[in-house]
């Protein structure tokens, strides 16, 4: 089976400042991958390269054995969907109108997918609300529904796609964080490749198949949660002492102990 996505020595720099350096990566169809690391580690820049939002200044990123730079914007939008870290809407669109922006097929065909997206993020009661009146978490869920609709409409034409999420749980309460993680897990089981930036190491360890750990622009670790969530590695990358235990499923979880002086 061909890889869903590959990066070969992919780097990105602005002038003489390297933001991401020589990342090599192979992502299989249906994998759920979490990208973790401290602020400024290069996580969002890496995700933007993997999505095609920016081109590597060196190396290459390929999706389905084809360089991302060769896709037209329309074809790229049909094959991958991206939830940005910040999406500000300054106009009084309704929740329905925002979500429908993700559809690229006939509305009659997309209607069941639209209804499913609204249900998945628990926004049935908010369909007609002005999005500018919603809380930050409600707005984030609205945009997640839009991205899901885009993904599913694209998959109707192209088959299993790619879902990229930049800090998708940043404004969500614990219930909706778990809802989103479960939804990402279901997408992966259906064949979608999911890559998400997460700051919650425990959420990453519980739901991800693999964890990529970024540090100072480099891919420092790539492996299973048990292989990456280790006290020595966490201390080196995050500069904090952490105790690693196991939950009832065997997944590692961390407890802050004492920051290094």
Swiss-Prot record:
Enzyme class (EC, first level): translocase
- InterPro entries per the UniProt record, alphabetical: AAA+_ATPase, ABC_transporter-like_ATP-bd, P-loop_NTPase
- Keyword annotations from UniProtKB, A to Z: ATP-binding, Cell inner membrane, Cell membrane, Membrane, Nucleotide-binding, Translocase, Transport
Q: Which gene encodes it?
A: hmuV
A GO cellular component term found in this entry reads: plasma membrane
Function of the protein? Part of the ABC transporter complex HmuTUV involved in hemin import. Responsible for energy coupling to the transport system.
Q: Provide the E.C. number(s) assigned to this enzyme.
A: 7.6.2.-
**UniProt-recorded Gene Ontology molecular function terms:** ATP binding; ATP hydrolysis activity
Please state which protein family the record places this protein in.
Belongs to the ABC transporter superfamily. Heme (hemin) importer (TC 3.A.1.14.5) family.
Q: Which residues form the ABC transporter domain?
A: 5-241
Q: What is this protein called?
A: Hemin import ATP-binding protein HmuV
Where on this chain does ATP bind?
37-44
Q: Where in the cell is it found?
A: Cell inner membrane
Quaternary structure note: The complex is composed of two ATP-binding proteins (HmuV), two transmembrane proteins (HmuU) and a solute-binding protein (HmuT).
Membrane topology, as annotated: Peripheral membrane protein
Which domain of life does this protein belong to? Bacteria
């Amino acid at each position: 089976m061909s890889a869903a996505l590959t990066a070969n020595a992919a780097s990105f720099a602005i002038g003489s400042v390297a933001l991401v350096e020589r990342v090599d990566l192979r992502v299989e169809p249906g994998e759920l991958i979490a990208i973790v690391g401290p602020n400024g580690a290069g996580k969002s820049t890496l995700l933007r390269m993997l999505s095609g939002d920016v081109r590597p200044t060196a190396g290459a990123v390929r999706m389905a054995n084809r360089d991302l730079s060769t896709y037209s914007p329309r074809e790229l939008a049909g094959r991958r969907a991206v939830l940005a870290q910040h999406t500000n809407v300054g106009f009084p669109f309704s929740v329905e109108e925002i979500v429908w922006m993700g559809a690229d097929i006939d509305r009659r065909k997309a209607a069941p997918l639209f209804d499913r997206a609204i249900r998945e993020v628990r926004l049935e009661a908010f369909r007609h609300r002005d999005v500018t009146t919603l809380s930050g978490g409600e707005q984030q869920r609205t945009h997640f529904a839009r991205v899901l609709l885009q993904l599913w409409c694209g998959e109707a034409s192209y088959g299993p796609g790619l879902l990229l999420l930049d800090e998708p749980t940043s404004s969500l309460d614990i219930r909706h964080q778990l809802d989103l993680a479960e939804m990402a897990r279901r997408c992966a089981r259906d064949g979608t490749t999911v890559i998400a930036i997460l700051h919650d190491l425990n959420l990453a360890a519980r739901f991800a198949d693999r964890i990529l750990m970024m540090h100072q622009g480099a891919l420092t670790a790539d492996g299973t949660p048990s292989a990456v969530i280790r006290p020595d590695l966490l201390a080196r990358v995050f500069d904090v002492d952490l105790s690693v235990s196991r939950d009832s499923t065997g997944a590692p979880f961390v407890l802050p102990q004492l920051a290094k002086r």
